[in-house]
Amino acid sequence: MMEKKAKIIATLGPAIYSEKKLKKIISLGVDAFRINFSHDITGVKQIISRIRKLENKLNKRIAVIADLQGIKLRIGKISSDKLRIKYKQKFTFDTNKKIGNNLRVCFPYSFIINKIKIGSKIFLDDGKFIFKVIEKNKKSLVTRCLSTNCILSSNKSVHIPNIKIPLNRLTKKDKKDISIAKRMGCNWIALSYIQNSDLIKETRKLINSDIGIISKIENKIAIKNIKEIINESDAIMIARGDLAIDIGHSEVPKVQLELIKKCAALSKPVIVATQMLESMIENASPTRAEINDVATAIFQGADVVMLSAETAIGKNPIQSVKTMSKTILSTEKYKKQHIDEFKSSIDAKKDTMKS
């Protein structure tokens, strides 16, 4: 039986914490687990220990990735796991550290608030939800929700187009999390919101030589400096959520292909991530567009594809992994057949020329 070549990363979360589910998704094709350090990691050390035992039991090498929060903007904690914000409702982002509710949430970046203009749009949760600024002062932004079915939870990412973040170094939290990741035995460190190679070099000084660095490409500046970033990194992740907001959704397919080609040319593994099987968070079956998205990444030459909320908090984590694995196998089989056909055609032409 043909085994898949492309790897699958599954994001750790409550949906797959049990040993039974971990064992099942590893047997279905998961090769690595991602820990999102932007969220609460209480109890994760125990889960990693569980993964290491399964690694030995199943005789399969499993990587663990520590995905650092970095300087990516995020909202604070919210009182409910799923807080619904109504369409056209007023909603405030402020510097108050109190737990958020359906009227406001903490946005602890006064230096960013000062830069935002009335009329600006704020994108939350990898661009899923949009808010428009209608009032502001030094400590808060009053917005109107422009999205239907807006459901927020704690620590979700925030992206504001055309606002430059003047930081390009590890935060105190990142440095602390690197120490935690080392103690946990993580194999990889993923760096968020990379702009150039500086952050990679700083991280390299803090980790052992056997820990790899994954640079997440999420903005125009990173694309501009892509060659130096690829050269200094051990792998690249195309984080399409924030990237789409920064460069425009219609530009992402082209940029994805270009980044995959550049990584191949420099012999660096490349990961395609974000919303690959997003509908399977709720639904047992994927959309045809999602299947095509996974297949396209494999056709283009991606070495790894990643599941995020699908495995972390989704209702169908096992089915999501099964779907991704099956799609990879089908696509790789097709690629192999056609490469073999192409080689046979070339050989036949050579024989004809000789005769």
What is the meaning of each model-derived region?
Residues 1-355:
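Non-catalytic helical/linker scaffolds that mediate oligomerization, partner binding
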